[in-house]
Amino acid sequence: RQKNSEGNMNEEPINSDISLGGEYELNGNTFEFTINPDFSQVEADQSKININSTTALRFEERRIFFNEGKDFLSSDLSTVYTRSINNPDYAMKVYNRGEKHSYYFLDAEDAQTPIIVPGYQRSYSGLLGKSHANIFSYNYNIEKGQNIGFLATNRDFEEGGNSSLFSLKGNFLFNEIYNTRFELVSTAMDEPISDVINTTNVSKEHTYNLDGESFEGYGGVFGISRDTENWSTRYYFATKSPNYRSDLGFTTENNWKKHSVEHKYKYRSDGFVRKGNVEIRKDLMQDYDGVIIDLSLIHI
C-alpha cells in the first residue's frame, strides 16, 4: 500500500476467488470435480515463444486434476491434449479401472479457449471465448495386454460451431510373436466465426481463418511387429488427412502419411562379448500428393 496526499494509507480492494474441489470413490468408480480452480502454475507457459517454430508449441500437462487418469486418453495421434482446456470455470470427471471394462468421462466449461488450426507443415493459433468440452473413453481388456476401445470428444464454442472426434483402437497378439495395433479416427468441424486468426494462406479446399466453414477429416495408425529371441521386425504407418482437425487434441500439421520399417538383430551370449545389437530403419513421410516431406535411413 501507498500513502495518499494526506499521509494516510490507501486502501486497495482485495481480489479473492473461491476454489472448490473434491474426490470420491464408490464401488470402484472415482469421481473428481473442481470449481473455479487456480491453475496459475501453468500460466507462465503461455508466454513462451519460439520464433523459429512455425507450429504451436506443446506444453507438458502439470495440473494434477488432468494428469490423474490421463492413461485412458493415450493415442499415437494425440487425439486428446488436456492443456486445450485452458482456464476452466469447472471440470468434473468419473472413471473406473475394471479388470475387463474401463471407462473415463470428463465434462468441463472453459472460460478462455485456445484453438489450433493445422495446415501443411505449419499451424495457426488463437484464443477464443467460452466453450464446453466432453471426453469419453472406453476400453475392453482381453488378455495378455490385448485390448480394444473407443474414444469420443466434443467441443461447443460460444462463438458458434463445434468440433467432434471419434476413434477406435486395438492391440492384438498372435502366435505369441506377432503383435498388431491400429487406431482409426474420424473428425468433423463446424468452425466458429472469429477474427482471432487472420491469414491469407489457404489450403486446397479451405481457408485457415475461422469463417464458419464445415468439413470432415480422418487419421489412422497401423503397426505390426514380429519378435523372437534374436530378431525383431516392425512396420508402422500413421496419417492425418488434409482436413484433419482435433480441437481437444494436439494437431499442428495435417496432410501427411508416414511409413517406418525397422529390422533388428539382438545378440546375447555368456561369452566374452555378452550382447550387441544391429539395426536398420527407414522412415518416409509424404503428403497426399505424393511429395516427399522427409526421408531417412538409419544404421546402428
Ranges and model annotations:
Residues Q2-K3, L26-G28, P37-Q41, G98-K100, ...:
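Transmembrane beta-strands of outer-membrane beta-barrel pores
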Residues R1-N139, G149-F150, G160:
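Structural preference for beta-rich elements and adjacent junctions enriched in aromatics
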